[in-house]
Amino acid sequence: MAELPTSHLAAAVLTDGNRALVAVIAVVALAALVLAGVLVRQVLAAGEGTDSMKKIAAAVQEGANAYLARQLRTLGVFAVVVFFLLMLLPADDWNQRAGRSIFFLIGAAFSAATGYIGMWLAVRSNVRVAAAAREATPAPGEPEKDLALVSHKATKIAFRTGGVVGMFTVGLGLLGACCVVLVYAADAPKVLEGFGLGAALIAMFMRVGGGIFTKAADVGADLVGKVEQGIPEDDPRNAATIADNVGDNVGDCAGMAADLFESYAVTLVAALILGKVAFGDFGLAFPLLVPAIGVLTAMIGIFAVAPRRSDRSGMSAINRGFFISAVISLVLVAVAVFVYLPGKYADLDGVTDAAIAGKSGDPRILALVAVAIGIVLAALIQQLTGYFTETTRRPVKDIGKSSLTGPATVVLAGISLGLESAVYTALLIGLGVYGAFLLGGTSIMLALFAVALAGTGLLTTVGVIVAMDTFGPVSDNAQGIAEMSGDVEGAGAQVLTDLDAVGNTTKAITKGIAIATAVLAAAALFGSYRDAITTGAADVGEKLSGEGAPMTLMMDISQPNNLVGLIAGAAVVFLFSGLAINAVSRSAGAVVYEVRRQFRERPGIMDYSEKPEYGKVVDICTRDALRELATPGLLAVMAPIFIGFTLGVGALGAFLAGAIGAGTLMAVFLANSGGSWDNAKKLVEDGHHGGKGSEAHAATVIGDTVGDPFKDTAGPAINPLLKVMNLVALLIAPAVIKFSYGADKSVVVRVLIAVVAFAVIAAAVYVSKRRGIAMGDEDDADPEPKSADPAVVS
């Protein structure tokens, strides 16, 4: 690894012109928040339907608010602890330390606010979508309604709800980064590390907690309701139905919004750190200019989702909005690049690295092509994920056919599809990263900055992507409210069924793109980590390469310590995924026992003479989700600390590389296999292979219950895991070097920190493994025999 000069690190300054540009970008971010407010008013202006629908929606709202309030109180304590720990880490001065800790809290607050706002509006718009679909069924004596108009109205309400969440995501992300740059100028990249960590930590907890809640309720509801009792999904007789609908909002809405918000924040962190080195003064503003363009085009894309009569389905209108946004983004970025950036590397003020300043070529070409790679990558992943998860494509149809031979072949078919699709998606992301890397030529910093710019290119589509994702749970909840109330029938029910099918596809597609944003953000952060090692080594007077360079500073994979780090990084991804899935299994078991108890002790539930106790299941899911948060979170934070202080920063870099590689493949495998099982179930429920109630249907329900924690808990949680570990590594790298070399070298301190980190991980995993599989384990007096269903006895 070639040693780089470090004098350029303080050379870049925020010029008056760039300060004005960043201020304008901040105004664009505020405009996104204003537009979100306008969209909120439009959504809430729609009708709410019957009293029965309003009562069900109110129960969902109450459950979602109660869960998120308890979760945020829990995370608030954790955030305060991290605030003070960040003050202990090395920085150039106390102003930087204080700024890093303060903006950690701001990043955490923005991430939580994005998730909360997404959930708050989703639980209010779902009943409005159901009410809009209800208009399709005419009252006695009324003429037939225009189904296309009714469907378009319902689609617009659902997508505008997503648009609000999308605008808050990009608006708050961009506003936070702009505030840091305006306040701290050239020191902004260091302070932004705290902002990114706050966003990433809260997003990971919301992803894990929301995922456990939603899938415990979903799996429990399906196993007892569909498989054992033979009643439909969202049937009001199922005690887990309200919890299932609450989970859709706290998991898919709040979790995904926070996830993409932190991808946004973390990518900007990496782009500004590397931009300052690679593009000097211009590097402090250009990484903000690209996502600002994305904010403007997201506004266009959201309003472009206006269904037409010629559309084959609601997906046609959504795809149209996405591609219009992407194309306009590319055109505007091209204009911005050639207007803002100079035509020669020598004209990049603030760059003192001779390898960059003396480079021939045009920096505008590098910037434009790198951003274009990110935009094109988003479009390609959208199509690739759609191919493996849509009901109209061969892979899902093949899983549907396999249901004729039982649940085992359904599970096997889904696993093989997930494994295969992971390869293609990983290759596509890898090509994107490598293509951007090649743009840098002989300069490693330019190459890494190009990767970060590809990430910002991907970010230009985030506003529309969040809108697409939120569309899924809103349409799913709308169908649930309609079915529980019994007030939407005939054509109206079909409108909601069609919307739900589109929503399943949008959720699967956005998971694929979210994984790509996570990987590009992690890759860019990896570049920032390399820069941190370079700076830290120079501070203690050590070389990074050549004769006499310490082995623990080099990321040479032929060294045993680095190979161990690589394997450990991959292993953490597997352990994290296992913990998340096991948490769902335990909590789902508790839900199954509770729903069975209610059916057994309240026989009147089946003939509607008694009402289930919905609140009991909501309480179980809330308790278990919050209880299970600690172990995955501590693993993500403590594992890099243990590796870094034990094996050194070189092995820690290899650890991050192993985590990024394994995490990419694992996340895609879990997301696509789970999505394909879900849509195979929908395919059978639409009347194929025997339809609802058939053995094929029961087989696909089992497949779907296996896939639920795959696609909605473990898979999505890997995204913030990668970025949390990268940010922790980035923050501790100077401390690891400080206590390993130079005047402050201390083996005792390193060993003490490593032992504490390992003890915390071991204790967290031990406590997690000691918990029972289900609450029935703790109730030996239960005379009922345990189910022999292998999907229940997990």
Curated annotation (Swiss-Prot):
Uppermost EC category: translocase
Localization of this protein: Cell membrane
Residues involved in Mg(2+) 2 binding: N245, D248, D476
Effect of A514S: Increased PPase activity and H(+) pump activity. The coupling ratio is approximately two-fold that of the wild-type
UniProt KW keywords: Calcium, Cell membrane, Hydrogen ion transport, Ion transport, Magnesium, Membrane, Metal-binding, Translocase, Transmembrane, Transmembrane helix, Transport
Stretches that traverse the bilayer: 20-40, 74-94, 102-122, 163-183, 194-214, 264-284, 285-305, 321-341, 365-385, 422-442, 446-466, 508-528, 564-584, 641-661, 717-737, 747-767
Chain sites annotated for binding substrate: K215, K711
Membrane topology designation: Multi-pass membrane protein
Residues at the site labelled Determinant of potassium independence: K507
Cofactors (names): Mg(2+)
Function: Proton pump that utilizes the energy of pyrophosphate hydrolysis as the driving force for proton movement across the membrane. Generates a proton motive force.
Family: Belongs to the H(+)-translocating pyrophosphatase (TC 3.A.10) family. K(+)-insensitive subfamily.
Name of the featured protein: K(+)-insensitive pyrophosphate-energized proton pump
Record organism: Streptomyces coelicolor (strain ATCC BAA-471 / A3(2) / M145)
